[in-house]
Each structure stands twice: as structure tokens, then as C-alpha cells.
């Protein structure tokens, strides 16, 4: 199937827009030591902030379901409004409280925009091509880390701590205009408009949908156990500063780019279920070998490369899989999928800091164990083909 030029323009533009808010979402971890110092926050406090951010995000489906009730474009625009407000807050409220508000609002923006745009492509792209298309849009996640985060580091290092947030504010406003101009107004007729309660009821009555949400929960919990502490681990072990931490982000971003490219290339061919299984099993192995590769900087970078490659392949393969589980409530299920990911990150954040004093190896082993739970849940995910 050859995609129309208009669809390609929407794919590319949505990828760039997602790169902007993903940069805001991802910049925190590699520059965590610098941000902690700048906002006078300790590891325990920032861990609780991450947990609060993710747990507040668990209510995001109420907001994100707007894509089912008011249209996909409305959901995307609402997400960019939240993002712009979040960056505006920290520019004018440069305190720990302002930083927490930024964390929450940028996460809510992601949680509202992302299911809306994924549901949009789920509506117009056949299931047997959806892995290819969504794999391309997910490149925004790795672009944020190996392009966006180093740019943030440059502004942070050469200008000041607030400069990156001002840049993100400008880009957020431009992104709003891009969505407004390139995506069609698609508000469903009032007579056919589903209610939030109806759609959520469909999800919670579906064992397959609940299993899919559990897979996402476990994958993200496992990843966050490493995500929260890897910057501190590199800093504690090797004394890496801003530029070197930005380099680490580039290494991880390249790994994720390869993982996303792998989804576009092979997930539709081998089946989404098999792709997720391969990715999660690979991440189990990567988690277990990561602590043993931390004797040198390059060894640590290589271990992180494999860890994020396998994680990204598994989580991006989950997206087209979930779009086919419950087509009748696709937008609401995708919203709950993002909420499940946020809940997983919240749980992982709560567990990461208490585990780290025992050694980084404890975080890695715990991540492997939780990934095994994801594999168990995957057995119960059944797709309703709608291609």
C-alpha cells in the first residue's frame, strides 16, 4: 500500500512535534545532577517528584479520551496547550515547585497528544502496515535523546539553566500551529459520539485489553528502575559532567533509533506479538549484563546501548499491537495504555532510589524480574484484526 503525500506530511510533522515534547520529557534524566543542583533538590526528593508526576499521569485518560469524544485533532491541540503552559510556568517560577509543575504538565501533554495521534493513524492506516508507520513516528523518542537533549545541554552549558525551557516554549507554540494547519477537524457527529464511560467500560470488560495494559505497565516499571539512576550511576562511577552526560544521551538515542527502525522494518512481518516477546527477552538479558559492563565508561555506554535498544524495540512494537486489540474504543485504550506506562514509571521511580544504595546491580536485577512478568501478561493479549 502506497501512502498518500498528505499522510506522509502528517507522519513527518507529527514526528517533529513529538520530538519537541519528548525532548522536554527526556532531558531530565541525563542532566539530573545539574537540575538537582540548580533547583536545590536531592535524590530522594526528585525520585518522589518522578513518582508524583507519573501517578498524576494515571488520571490522564480522562483528558486523553477527548480524542474519542471530540476528535483526534482536538486531542492533539489540547496536548500542545498543556505543554506550552508547562514550559511557561517554569520560565516564570524558577523553583523546585515550578520544576515539579513542569514535570507534571509536560507529562500530561505527552499523555494527551500521543494517544490522539496514534489513534488517528490507527484510523487511517491498515493494521498490517501500522507497525511501519508507528515505528517511523516513534523515531521522535530517539531524536529527542540524541538530538534534542544534546541541544538542551548546549543551551544549559553556554547560556543558563532557563534557556532550554524558553526554547521549548517557543517550539511548543509553533507545534500547536503545525497541528492546527496539517490535521483535519474530525469531531464526530453528536448522534454518534461515544461517552467516556462507554469506552472505558469496553476496555475494562476486555481481558485482552487489560493484559495489554499490564504488559506496558511492567515494561515501563522495569525501564524506570534503571532510567532514574543511570545518570547518577555514571556520575558516581566516572564523574561525568554536562558534556559527557549529553554524549551518553546520544549513545542511548542511537540505540533507540535502531530499535524504532527495527519495528518499522520487521514487526509487521514477524507479527507484533513475536516482536514484543523478542524485545522483552532481550531486555531481560541486557538488564542482567549491564552491571558487569560498568568497569569502564565505554563498557557502561555499550551496556546502556543494548538495554535501551531492546526496551525501545519492545515498547514500540506494543503500540501497533494495542491499536488492534479493541478498535471500537481505540483512542480510550491508547489513553489508558499511556496511563499504564506512566503508572509503571511511577512505580519504577518509587523503587529505584531505595534500591540504588545496595548498588546499581540491584536496580538491574529488579528490572529483569519485572520484565518476566510482562512476558507472562503478553500470553493473554489477543488482537481483533481490523485491516
Predicted regions and their residues:
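Juxtamembrane intracellular "pre-TM" segments in multi-pass secondary transporters
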Residues: 1-5, 184-212
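Extracytoplasmic gate region of multi-pass secondary transporters
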Residues: 28-29, 210-249
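C-terminal transmembrane helical hairpin of 12-TM major facilitator-type secondary transporters
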Residues: 273-318
Amino acid at each position: 500500500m502506497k501512502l498518500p503525500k498528505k499522510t506522509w506530511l502528517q507522519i513527518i510533522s507529527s514526528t517533529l512535534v513529538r520530538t519537541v515534547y519528548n525532548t522536554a520529557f527526556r532531558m531530565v534524566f541525563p542532566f539530573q545532577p545539574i537540575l538537582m543542583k540548580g533547583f536545590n533538590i536531592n535524590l530522594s526528593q526528585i525520585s518522589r517528584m518522578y513518582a508524583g508526576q507519573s501517578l498524576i499521569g494515571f488520571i490522564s485518560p480522562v483528558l486523553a479520551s477527548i480524542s474519542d469524544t471530540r476528535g483526534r485533532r482536538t486531542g492533539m491541540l489540547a496536548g500542545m496547550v498543556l505543554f506550552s503552559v508547562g514550559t511557561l510556568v517554569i520560565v516564570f517560577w524558577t523553583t523546585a515547585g515550578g520544576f515539579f509543575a513542569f514535570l507534571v504538565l509536560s507529562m500530561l501533554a505527552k499523555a494527551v497528544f500521543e494517544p490522539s495521534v496514534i489513534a488517528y493513524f490507527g484510523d487511517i492506516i491498515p493494521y498490517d502496515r501500522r507497525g511501519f508507520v508507528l515505528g517511523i513516528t516513534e523515531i521522535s523518542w530517539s531524536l529527542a535523546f540524541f538530538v534534542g537533549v544534546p541541544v538542551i545541554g548546549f543551551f544549559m552549558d553556554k547560556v543558563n539553566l532557563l534557556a532550554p525551557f524558553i526554547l521549548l516554549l517557543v517550539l511548543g507554540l509553533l507545534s500547536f500551529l503545525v497541528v492546527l494547519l496539517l490535521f483535519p477537524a474530525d469531531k464526530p457527529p453528536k448522534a454518534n459520539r461515544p461517552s467516556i464511560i462507554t469506552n472505558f467500560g469496553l476496555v475494562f470488560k476486555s481481558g485482552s485489553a487489560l493484559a495489554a495494559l499490564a504488559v506496558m505497565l511492567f515494561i515501563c516499571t522495569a525501564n524506570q528502575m534503571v532510567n532514574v539512576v543511570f545518570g547518577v550511576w555514571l556520575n558516581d562511577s566516572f564523574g561525568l559532567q554536562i558534556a559527557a552526560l549529553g554524549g551518553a544521551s546520544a549513545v542511548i538515542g542511537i540505540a533507540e533509533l535502531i530499535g524504532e527502525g527495527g519495528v518499522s522494518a520487521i514487526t509487521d512481518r514477524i507479527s507484533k506479538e513475536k516482536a514484543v516477546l523478542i524485545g522483552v527477552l532481550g531486555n531481560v538479558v541486557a538488564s542482567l549484563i549491564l552491571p558487569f559492563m560498568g568497569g569502564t565508561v565505554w563498557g557502561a555506554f555499550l551496556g546502556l546501548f543494548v538495554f535501551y535498544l531492546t526496551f525501545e524495540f519492545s515498547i514500540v512494537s506494543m503500540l501497533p499491537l494495542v491499536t488492534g486489540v479493541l478498535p471500537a474504543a481505540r483512542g480510550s485504550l491508547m489513553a489508558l495504555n499511556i496511563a499504564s506506562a506512566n503508572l509503571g514509571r511511577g512505580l519504577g521511580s518509587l523503587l529505584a532510589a531505595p534500591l540504588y544504595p545496595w548498588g546499581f546491580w540491584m536496580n538491574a536485577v529488579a528490572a529483569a524480574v519485572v520484565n518476566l512478568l510482562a512476558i507472562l501478561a503478553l500470553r493473554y493479549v489477543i488482537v481483533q484484526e481490523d485491516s
